[in-house]
Every structure is written in structure tokens, then in C-alpha cells.
């Protein structure tokens, strides 16, 4: 496994991360039945990835994304919290909602997330996220309080990620790209501002 420094966070993460969609169950009716391992099975899969060198685990809040946080928390407890980097997120855009989401995620995980993203930020919610006591302000507040280590914005829109790259409150960005859809990634690679932030890519296999 190869590793990279994640921007200026000081985190060194595996090039291949573990996204927790394949281990979740509950409240996700669009997923087929095989996406339903129990906790023991889910922990075994995550441990196998860890033994192959993966140290970055990306999840999202219960209940919207099933029980993945709970299973990841069980894995972190078994393997040792200091051995992995936990990236978490919630699709909330106001400051109050985001603040409460982080508290709930921390309870589900049984530990403090390393990175927490406002998830799937779109043009309809962009100004809310970056505005006065929006999600960005709440994440910065949570970081100052030690409830998360780093702040993040996740989006499918280049202009929103660029806005995050210009924002001193934001440490890490997350966008989508894969071998079939490289348009946004190519633009990001050409923009020097993105080199000042950590960047995670999701949907690299055009799946979860």
C-alpha cells in the first residue's frame, strides 16, 4: 500500500480508503440484500482491509446511511483507535444541525472523528453552508472544541469545492471521480488552490 500526506493536516493516509456503504444495513431500501453483513462480518472485512494496508475509513451518519458508523466504531475499538483515520459526514447545512450531527456521530462511533464533512453540498445549500453560522462555522467551532480534528466539505460540484479551497475554515475536500468521469478531477489538478487542502476522492469505482 502507498500512503500520502493529506494536505496540511499531518495525517498520512493510504491511497485506497475503505468506504462503508458495503457494510451497512438498515434504512437503505435501495441497496440489495447482500449489503447487510452483521457487525462481526463487517468488522472482519474492515480488519482484512487494514491488514492489506488500508488506514482510511470513510463513513456517514446513522440513520441516513444505515448502521455503518456503529460497525466502524466496533472495528476501531478492536483494532486500536490510533491505527486508523476516520472520515465522517452528514448531509446537514445549518450550523445547529451540523453541530448536533457531529455529537450524534461521535456517540455512534464511540470516538472522535478525525475529519467531518458537510456532505453533498449543492448550489441550493451552498450559501447556507458557507454563510453566517452555517455548517462551515459549526465545523470550525467543533474543531476548536476538540470534538473533531479537521473540517471538510464534500460536493459533486467543482465551484463549491473551489469555494471550500479558498475558505480558511475548511481543511479537507471530497469530490467524485473515476476512470470514466475525470472532468472535475482534471480541473482540480490544474487549480493550485486545491494543493493547499487535503482531498479525498469518492466513487473511484463508480460505486460506494
Task: Locate predicted features.
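N-terminal binding-site loop/beta-alpha segment at the start of enzyme catalytic domains
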Residues: 1-84, 144
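Beta/alpha (TIM)-barrel catalytic core signal, keyed to glycine-rich beta->alpha loops juxtaposed to Asp/Glu
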Residues: 3, 119-208
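Acidic (Asp/Glu)-rich catalytic clusters
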Residues: 7-10, 51, 73-83, 102-112, ...
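Hydrophobic faces of well-ordered beta-strands that scaffold small-molecule active sites
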Residues: 14-18, 57-59, 84-88, 113-118, ...
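Feature marks short, surface-exposed loop/turn motifs that line or immediately flank catalytic pockets
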Residues: 22-25, 63, 92-94, 119-124, ...
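Short, acidic/polar
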Residues: 34-49, 95-109, 155-165
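Acidic-and-aromatic substrate-binding clefts and catalytic sites of carbohydrate-active enzymes
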Residues: 60-69, 91-98, 124-127, 178-185
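CE4/NodB-like, metal-dependent polysaccharide N-deacetylase domain
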Residues: 99-117, 141-145
Amino acid at each position: 500500500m502507498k500512503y500520502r500526506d493529506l494536505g496540511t493536516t499531518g495525517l498520512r493516509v493510504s491511497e485506497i480508503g475503505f468506504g462503508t456503504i458495503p457494510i451497512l444495513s438498515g434504512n437503505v431500501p435501495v441497496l440489495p440484500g447482500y449489503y447487510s453483513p452483521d457487525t462481526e462480518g463487517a468488522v472482519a472485512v474492515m480488519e482484512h482491509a487494514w491488514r492489506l494496508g488500508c488506514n482510511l475509513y470513510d463513513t456517514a451518519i446513522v440513520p441516513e446511511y444505515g448502521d455503518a458508523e456503529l460497525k466502524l466504531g466496533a472495528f476501531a475499538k478492536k483494532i486500536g483507535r490510533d491505527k486508523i483515520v476516520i472520515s465522517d459526514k452528514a448531509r446537514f447545512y445549518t450550523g445547529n444541525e451540523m453541530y448536533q450531527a457531529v455529537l450524534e456521530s461521535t456517540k455512534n462511533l464511540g470516538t472522535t472523528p478525525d475529519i467531518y464533512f458537510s456532505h453533498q453540498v449543492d448550489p441550493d445549500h451552498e450559501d447556507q453552508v458557507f454563510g453566517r453560522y452555517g455548517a462551515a462555522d459549526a465545523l470550525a467551532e467543533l474543531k476548536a472544541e476538540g470534538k473533531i480534528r479537521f473540517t471538510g466539505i464534500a460536493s459533486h460540484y467543482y465551484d463549491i469545492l473551489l469555494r471550500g479551497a479558498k475558505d480558511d475554515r475548511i481543511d479537507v475536500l471530497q469530490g467524485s471521480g473515476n476512470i470514466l468521469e475525470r472532468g472535475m478531477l482534471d480541473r482540480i489538478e490544474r487549480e493550485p488552490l486545491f494543493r493547499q487542502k487535503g482531498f479525498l476522492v469518492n466513487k473511484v469505482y463508480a460505486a460506494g
